[in-house]
Amino acid sequence: MADNEIKILSAGAPKTGVARCAEAFTKKTGIPVVYEFATAPVLKETVGAGECDADIVVAPVAVAEAFEAGGHTVAGSGAIVGSVKAAVTIKNGAMEPDLSTAETLKQAILSADSVVYNEASSGQYIASMIEKMGITEAIAGKVTITKTGSAVMQHLDASSLTNEIGFGQATEIQVQIDKGMNVKLLGTLPQEVEKISTYKSALLTGSAGNQAAKNLLDFMASEEGQQIYKATGLI
């Protein structure tokens, strides 16, 4: 990393907004910003172990607050980035399940030939939802758990099945669609089981004296930064 370079370590769901904010900041200031994306469990492990060389971290609120409580981020430096809804994705041309209620979603999961979600925090919620529906054992033989959110869409894209259902963050699904992946954002989860994940940025303690990083955080929290995030699907 260059001496004047700012590094962001972020969860995957807000990745497009984080990247575009970073690019806009660089355009304004000339200061280069690099970014890396990881799942929330990896963020916890990396930052918690003191092995993170980034200046700024963007994580789910609960994770970000744990970082602050553990002294890994500067107290009071955080700001809400935005929120993302969990959603359903399928391959283009596949059967389209009814997402109108929790019960129709449950039946869609039971009748699907394959169910795909990730091991990150968003996927952990899906596993919990399925457990609360009482169908974990019934579908155990047809579940695929991927490492990342993007891997869910990659799996669907490569699949020959016509009745397969995947889950992920709406923003991540849209990123893959924009890249040309042959998948569809079918819709968000029904209201009864809706999942909204909120993300927060913060300054890592090792960069407490990095004024440029502080300025980037301020930009991310500004009206201009928030408009950039909203334009990428964050709410």
Please place each PLM-identified region on the residue numbering.
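Exported/periplasmic ABC-transporter solute-binding proteins
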Residues: 1-36, 41-48, 55, 61-70, ...
